Amino acid sequence: MCVLKSRRKGFSFKGGSMMCRNYYLIPASKSYVYAANKQYLTDDGILTKAWDYMDFIDKHTAWGKKRSVNTAMRKRAGFISKDEYGNEVELGYKSEIIGVTLKDNPDVVRGKKANLILFEEAGSCKELAAAWQIARPSVEIDGVAFAPMIAFGTGGDEDSNFATLKDMFYNPEGYNCLGLPNIWDETPTDKECGFFCP
């Protein structure tokens, strides 16, 4: 799905909640969020919001989970125990939320089977076109999606970075995205577009 939006619409909160839903309710799930810069993930970014949700859920609800990995870019539900032979083994839910920065290298998305993939601040990501196509096999079998992949963002600071998100919006079928009737453009058209949040 391609989402073109204006600023301050809460999509980092929405994305964080989607990842937490998988983390707490789907064992061994993997939710990835990709961004061009680490600051879009951390600081006041989507992962920080997800971690705040997790801290609240762990403290105030019955769904709390221990974390076998607990870093600024990755959380994994689980714990280490010893088996009858004294070997350390990981037990628990084993669901994960993982943040990855593209850093001018769209190949970092390759080979990651996922239950959810988000592209944060996609309008500022010059690697979006290549990364999207490379990531598609992570959520598709023979062109049929078994998990959602969502790119959302606003126009970037540089026109060239926004070009791919704009193309995805006006040509959703070319990216295997959900197409919706285009009721937003001044000139009526029967072509479909991505999701728009004014």
Positions of predicted regions on the chain:
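Phosphate/NTP-binding elements of NTP-utilizing enzymes
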Residues: 1-198
